Amino acid sequence: MKRINLLLVVFFLVGFVAEVFPQQNFSTSLHSTRQGKIHWYNKVENGGVGGFEVLTNVPITQLGCVECHDAVDANGNQYPANYTPGCVDCHATNSTWAVTQSDCLGCHGRERAIINMQLPDVHRSLGFTCMTCHKEEELHGDDGIAYNSMFEPGAIQADCSNSGCHAGFTHPNPGVDPHGGKLHCTSCHAQTNLACYSCHFESQVQTHLKRTYKQITGFVFLVNRTKDNKVHPATFQAITYEGKAGVAFGPSVAHTIVKTGARTCTDCHQNFGGQIPAITDFNADGVIKFATWNTADSTLSWHQGIVPFPANYQTSLKMDYLTYNGNVSDPVAPSKNWSVVKDVADLFQVLYCTPLTKQQMAKIGMDTTLVSVEPINNNIPSSFALEQNYPNPFNPSTTIRYSIPKSAYVELKVYDGLGNLVQALVNEYLSAGNYETKFNGANLSSGVYYYQINAGEFTATKKLVLMK
């Protein structure tokens, strides 16, 4: 009998150790560090990527959202004022230690909103929960790597092609797959993404209330995800604060997956006979006005369907950024008491993805003559460079060549001798390569001008002479 009891104790200890030991790295997991918001929001000097703190100058520690948590822990107890993330966030430590779907959705509000909207999903209809795809080793940070964001490669291991899911799956007709595996499954199978439109940041700063105009769906931004360089859905978060506007874009999989029928060729390709509002908008004048505030009835309208994230997004992607006109202490509730601040962002963040290239834009029927840059060749340069324009002196036009060794947002501008901006020649995201841009001075007076390039951390200026 003693031997049996001893064996039971041994089995219990072995099981307990096996269960607990992998969690020794929990302190470096994103569920513990909550590093994602810090990385996204903070200035570079404060450990971030130059996020909204650049606009607000309000430290994230004053926002009441660093140690984000649900109203109660998994045991049903309210959180204390001083709180350290731990097991009880997800595990009912006073009973079975089981994790429920509601424990996940208490923090992951975007997914909760999608479910509450009753948007269908093939996985949920089969009884899947968060933990079906997101395994313990991912949630507990078993690899011991302190990720800055869940979008970093390795942070989230769940993917369509994982073993036990759709591993080895190929296009139903691989012999004629026009995309050659360059599209992520969700680009076609996700019905919609979701965004909380235009966060009123004064409410967050002063009263710690999360106030947005409304949650919007029906759209899918398309970007190139840096994790695998595949076309992938993206969403955004926009804010306004004291007359300034900022927006951050990143890859996102809304759990609105359907088996068939989410997206066909004409849902993305205007040149295949499709009628895509965002592409029609762009082809008219080179600008996608994604969302428009209707002053007459205080409502918002926005493009439905796919929205290509264009190469020159800083000048070609606009939306009406809104502010709340009521008191910051007002209860958060649907309201028409909003108005437009501006339609051009003061700050753009594009994280863990890149815009569609000019070539990709052309393939879906976008008028790329509205994008000003032409690549010279397919060679990848080893360093940044800005060449002397030729001819120089010139009349009336000249060519400016430059090289970028890695993808970057590029600005190329011409100034007069007093430093006044004459013309912005380039204002778009470019892949690594060698490029040239034409400058026409037909409407300018003879004289000395300057052209300057800004690409990532690279800046250079050269002189050009217009002689008529």
Region locations from a protein language model:
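C-terminal outer-membrane/trafficking sorting elements
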Residues: 375-468
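Acidic, His- and aromatic-enriched active-site or binding-groove loops in soluble protein domains
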Residues: 97
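Residues in and immediately flanking transmembrane alpha helices
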Residues: 15-16, 206, 405
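Bacterial N-terminal signal peptides
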Residues: 8-15
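Positively charged n-region of N-terminal signal peptides that target proteins for export
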Residues: 1-4, 468
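C-type cytochrome heme-c attachment and multiheme electron-transfer modules
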Residues: 20-88, 100-374, 381
